[in-house]
Amino acid sequence: GDILDLGPDYRARQDANDRALLDELQTRLADEDHPKVRQDLEILIQSITDEIETRRINREFMLPYYNIHQLIFGSFNALLDPRNDNSRYAKALDRLRKYNGSEPGFTPITELAMARSSERFDDGLLGPYQGEVDKDLSDASRYIAGTRTFFERAGLEGWEDEFAKLEAQLDEYAAWVEAEMLPRARTGNQLPAEVYANNLKNFGVRATPDELIREAQYVYQFIRSEMKALALRIADERSWEDSDLVSVIRRLKAEQIPQGDLIDIYKERLADIEEIIRREDIITLPERDASIRPATEAESAAVPAPFMSPPQLINNTGQYGEFVLVQSNPALGEDAIMDDWSHDAITWALTVHEARPG
């Protein structure tokens, strides 16, 4: 039932907790002889050190901003996941009361988020990207509706009044974001160099932005050349007059699969791929079937591209990942339906990537 700490001086508490954990890990490292255990400890130490540095950099440059609607959606999505043991579901009521401040000793998380942002309004920091804030406001109602669906599906009792209280707080928070954060948002998406480089590092990229740009320019041209050669082959095999890369991609994307048939087609592709894997003895496959399902509207708002939804990793009792097929980006309004993942050519590569063996 624990929730995100956004109380006063929360960053100092986070740093203190992490430094205490660092001391413990470094003590264990000094007493450890096994090379693989030492390696694990060194990885943990580096990860925590990076987290402390990330908080320092963000505090120096960036105005705090929180997408509370998405945070709460993700929190209950993980807890009330149908793949979980339903004995955990009752904890959602405790978590709900903590989020909305009904639980003694807790302040509504929306109030804390507003306080943490507004206390730094005068520090000359860089605001969030305007496009990000606009999208968050557009998706707010979808996250609320999606979170409500989790509670309805879980079959819990006595959540409705507490949820209504939280929903009212979220509506108030959205109005505050529009009135206070949106005017402070930056119009360009470029980040300070220090923040950008640190973000890269947190994704495992230790190269500097300049090094990465140079490498990307070279690799882009290399991959594009390979794609052009492949486009020529495809056009020749299909007797298409236009054989340039863009024309071939457009022709391939025009081969759209009806929405009602899409999941079945992906399951057919999966069966074909698994047969190839068995025939060629590439890897050992699980005995259970892989799961492929369409995304909900709220999931599409959170991740507007197909993704693998991982199971719980701690105390896993047999839960497994799901290939979630996203077919729309709700933030785009009339252009919400995408054609990137529903044409025949993409079904093979995407199934390999998100299902098996990916």
Model regions: which residues?
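N-terminal maturation segment of proteins
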Residues: 1-358
